[in-house]
């Protein structure tokens, strides 16, 4: 029995060591980095990392756009940010309630986390079920992950961090409550999942394609230069 337990331990250690998201920030504009997820479905291979997250390094501190699919991802995101700047994270903005965008919130429990009111309501209503489903699909990557509802409620308008005025835009076409963030200094537009590239749309929470198309037309009209 002792030999069997030792063997199981040796088998499990490499498996745990492989649970590394290996996040690599890519600079897309001044003070702005993106961490690109895979163009895949959820799997035990990718750990749910099929999301594009990002962060802006302002004079006031770092603003994070989406926290990712798990506590482990959120922790890796904080480490990646620390590799770019020694400024603290001062704000997390969640674009919508889907699990790959909001289940990393625990890693930022010491930071103000904000979302649209509809996103907060959806996370409170559906978050546990979404997390449980992701646990089934990606396994141990999700260890310790629990739903953390954003404490702050966002309204459309402009919030400024240092020299970066961020225009907060509220839509609904993808999830029923979708935040897009336009940095008016750099022209970077974080569109969340309102935009898909070479992937089928995910529509279980969409109010309808007509609304989604209208949202896309409004996004297209924004003065963006880089689209995330």
Sequence positions of predicted segments:
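Solvent-exposed loop/turn segments at secondary-structure junctions
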Residues: 39-42, 62, 69-72, 97-101, ...
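Sec-dependent signal peptide recognition
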Residues: 1-7
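Solvent-exposed, acidic/flexible segments
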Residues: 45-49, 67-74, 98-101, 116, ...
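Active-site HxH/HxHxD metal-binding segment of metal-dependent hydrolases
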Residues: 72-75, 79-158
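Metallo-beta-lactamase
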Residues: 18-28, 61-63, 69-71, 121-170, 172-228, ...
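Conserved beta-strand hairpin/beta-sheet module of binuclear metal-dependent hydrolase folds
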Residues: 27-80, 180-192
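N-terminal signal peptide c-region/cleavage motif recognized by signal peptidases
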Residues: 12-14
